[in-house]
């Protein structure tokens, strides 16, 4: 089958009429579309699904977790923390019950991902001392929360009280699971001083959190799967400050 010609020229004795067959307005001239330079890396990362391996097609996670419904809601927690050698804990799954875009509708919701952004920094009196201090972050799931969050020393077993060797105690392994572990380092001294370090982590979780009938966003109102962020620095005498913004992206459950 022959291709349709781009245009047809109809010749008459009086005039020549050029008829266009692209069905657009005859009064608009053709404007050249701006060309965007695409690199090989962008072409490879944005390739269609049929060009990816079978694993990407079979085990592709859905946008909305199973058993949940949209829209995607966001809850942020901003605070400055004094991180010591003995550790500190904050609850990052505190969500108030309500009808807003930052509230949970009922008792159950699924935390799809969490975004930790901020920095750790030293005081003016500490940064001139020759030392290296590393802050260890542990994102922990508490399967059976009750009362108040347990301290760092109660959950983790550290050799010689060193947070870098922290592991969950044997009798608490069924209750606490470390979902992600990361760290950031600052260095003090007159030379090669690094008084602050950035913290930027995006973590995919898909953790189903269950509350009781209360509306307040508190740890004691959790009944299942509370998310806790434990922090501890490796230096015993020099504390570190952490200015963090923790954002959780969650979906409401259909069982509410």
Curated annotation (Swiss-Prot):
GO BP terms, alphabetized: symbiont entry into host cell; viral penetration into host nucleus
MF term (GO), any: structural molecule activity
Pfam families: Gemini_coat
unnamed zinc finger locations on the chain: 68-85
Keywords of this entry: Capsid protein, DNA-binding, Host nucleus, Metal-binding, T=1 icosahedral capsid protein, Viral penetration into host nucleus, Virion, Virus entry into host cell, Zinc, Zinc-finger
Motif window: Nuclear export signal: 101-122
GO cellular component: host cell; host cell nucleus; T=1 icosahedral viral capsid
Motif annotated as Nuclear localization signal, chain positions: 40-54
Motif (Bipartite nuclear localization signal): 3-20, 200-247
Subcellular location: Virion; Host nucleus
Subunit: Homomultimer. Binds to single-stranded and double-stranded viral DNA. Interacts (via nuclear localization signals) with host importin alpha-1a.
Protein family per UniProt: Belongs to the geminiviridae capsid protein family.
Protein name per UniProt: Capsid protein
Taxonomic lineage: Viruses, Monodnaviria, Shotokuvirae, Cressdnaviricota, Repensiviricetes
């Amino acid at each position: 089958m022959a291709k349709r010609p781009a245009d047809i020229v109809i010749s008459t004795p009086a005039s020549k009429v050029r008829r266009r067959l692209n069905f657009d307005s005859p009064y608009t001239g053709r404007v050249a579309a701006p060309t965007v330079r695409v690199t090989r890396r962008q072409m490879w990362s944005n390739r269609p699904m049929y060009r990816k391996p079978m694993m990407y097609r079979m085990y592709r996670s859905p946008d909305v977790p199973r058993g949940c419904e949209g829209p995607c809601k966001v809850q942020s927690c901003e605070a400055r923390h004094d991180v010591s050698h003995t550790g500190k804990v904050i609850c990052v799954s505190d969500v108030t019950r309500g009808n807003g875009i930052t509230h949970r509708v009922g008792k159950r919701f699924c935390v799809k991902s969490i975004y930790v952004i901020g920095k750790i920094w030293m005081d003016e009196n500490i940064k001139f001392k020759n030392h290296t201090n590393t802050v260890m972050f542990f994102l922990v799931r508490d399967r059976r929360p009750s009362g108040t969050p347990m301290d760092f020393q109660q959950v983790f077993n550290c050799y010689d009280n060193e947070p870098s060797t922290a592991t969950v105690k044997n009798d608490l392994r069924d209750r606490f699971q470390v979902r992600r572990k990361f760290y950031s380092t600052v260095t003090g001294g007159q030379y090669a001083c690094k008084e602050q370090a950035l913290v930027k982590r995006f973590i995919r979780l898909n953790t189903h959190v269950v509350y009781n009938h209360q509306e307040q966003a508190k740890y004691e109102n959790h009944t299942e799967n509370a998310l806790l962020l434990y922090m501890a620095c490796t230096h015993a005498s020099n504390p570190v400050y952490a200015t963090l913004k923790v954002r959780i992206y969650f979906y409401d459950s259909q069982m509410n």
